[in-house]
Amino acid sequence: MDRRENDRRYRSRAEMLRDRRRRRKRTCLIELLIVLFFIIVVVAVAGIFVWKKYGPSKVKADLNEYYGVDAAEQAAVIVNNTILEQKGIVSDGQFYLPYEAVRQEIDGGFYWNAAEGTLRYALPLDLVEVPAESKEYTNAGQRESKDYVIVKNIGDQTYIAVDFILEFGNVTAKTYKSPNRVVLFDDWGKVKTTTAKKDTQMRWLAGVKSDVLAEVKKGDRVYFIEEEGDWKKVRTEDGIIGYIKSSALKSVKTETITSSSKAPEYTSMTKDYKINLAWHQVTNEIANETLSETIASTQGLTTISPTWFTVADTEGNLNSIASSAYVDTAHAANLEVWALVRDFDGGIDSPEETYQLLSSSLARKTLIDNLMMQVQQYNIDGINVDFEKVSEECGEHFIEFIRELSIECRRNQKVLSVDNYVPMGFNSHYELEEQGKVADYVIIMGYDEHYAGSWESGSVASIDYVENGIRQATKDVSAEKVINAVPFYTRLWEEVPKTEQELAAQAGTEQAQYKMNVTSEALGMQEAEACVAQAGAAVTWDEETQQNYAQWESDGATYKIWLEDSSSIEAKLKLMEKYQLGGVAAWKLGFEKPEIWSVIEKYIK
């Protein structure tokens, strides 16, 4: 009995121990599961945090905000790879672009005259004219019409219908909704493109957290703009510009894109030889009789430009001292005559008058008609325009005058050349690029680096100044149309120290930077050399300006002169050769030494 009881008690204790062990195991397992659960929760929370912080955003960008379109009638304007700040409009189902954007970014040939309320476009042989708020227009005097209003005025802004623009420019355009936008392309030739390897997303900025601009499908072509780290900036066909991961795109390749549109062809009267032009300053009819003796010592001269025409008034009337005998003499010497017309010295003579003249369509027409009458009457070969009073606000009126004059010159087979200052920021309103499209020659007056009103002495035409003018001009105009003009003159400078009183009076002004009072006079080549010889001054070659230089003291003044001679002119002619220009011009006949002509002739053959 006792043994059985002991066995029972023993088994009971053993079972209790087993139960305890099982309970402890269950407790440990539960505790382990709880720990594992908390670990999983922590990892999940951390993962979510990391994903939110570093994972790609799925937020769709607001395209209205992206394009800056904040009104239902507004339309974004995309030109090639640029979204313009200016906005177009949609009216009666037609897309319209702001005039300034059209002129600056798409086609500078459009000309809007706000005072007259007309839009013009000069074709090679005819003029298109459109009144505002009209479906009708004239082309070569013939009335035509569209089924939409061509030009709209809203507030102080003028808009042109996209469909009308496409009739003239070498540009394509596609329009889209949601949001309204116009995508224009005129960057013909070689462009860089790439293709999506897989479905991917375009983002606003180069980063996965940036908002999504567009879904890009596998095989979609995009236009490559630039690389930014692991991203590529690209443009879609429908004008969205953003970033795609480089790994989602194939290698960039170069394609050639050609235009299917037909832009107007402005034929040119450029010659098959280098131009060697000299301006002949003629101030009265009697001076015309000096031509034979004036050109007697020249060599290789191809063209002469007498200063015959001045604009008499702001209505477009002309003062003329043209001569048939002069033209006959020039033609007998195998010279073409390109008669010069100017807006100074002898008629109108201020920026205000030039503006009044050129901003009037009637005055421009009157002036052009008067010029062509003279050309026909005297058998003149071409017109040389020398307008030096064109203000910035007059710039677009000036270039429209050149375009309209080019129509008549083209119709009558007469050469049109335009004189220009050395291109700089402050005279960019002369619009060399537009001149180069319609004029036969664009002449750069490569002198007056230092002029009569300069506050310091200096060269009239140092080599760097001349080359900069040529370099800038040939960026905008075909080299064969560019003529560089050289000076047959120089300036003798006189410097006298400013007094203390003068310096005090000029304190705080730009003029105060210059410690000398300077005056100068223009001298021809022979006169300049005689002046140096009379002073007994030594002449040294100045490598920086590529000119011979002399300096001397006399009666408390310092005299300085940078000579123009065979050496300096040849240095400038080498630039003509280097840039393969259309020729050389010179101001003015009678200022040169005879041996200059053999130097010039060497470079124009």
Spans of model-derived segments:
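Hydrophobic faces of well-ordered beta-strands that scaffold small-molecule active sites
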Residues: 276-280, 302-306, 337-341, 383-385, ...
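Glycan-binding loop/region signatures in secreted carbohydrate-active enzymes
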Residues: 259-261, 346-347, 353, 490-572, ...
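Primary recognition of N-terminal secretory signal peptides and signal-anchoring hydrophobic helices
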Residues: 13-228, 258-270
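Substrate-binding surface in catalytic domains of secreted glycosidases
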Residues: 314-321, 369, 392-530
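Active-site-adjacent "subsite" loops/lids of carbohydrate-active enzymes
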Residues: 345-373, 377, 444-454
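Catalytic domains of carbohydrate-active enzymes, especially glycoside hydrolases
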Residues: 287-312, 370-383, 572-583
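Boundary/entry segment of secreted carbohydrate-active catalytic domains
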Residues: 199-201, 240, 245-294
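SH3/SH3-like beta-barrel fold
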Residues: 121, 219, 231-236, 244
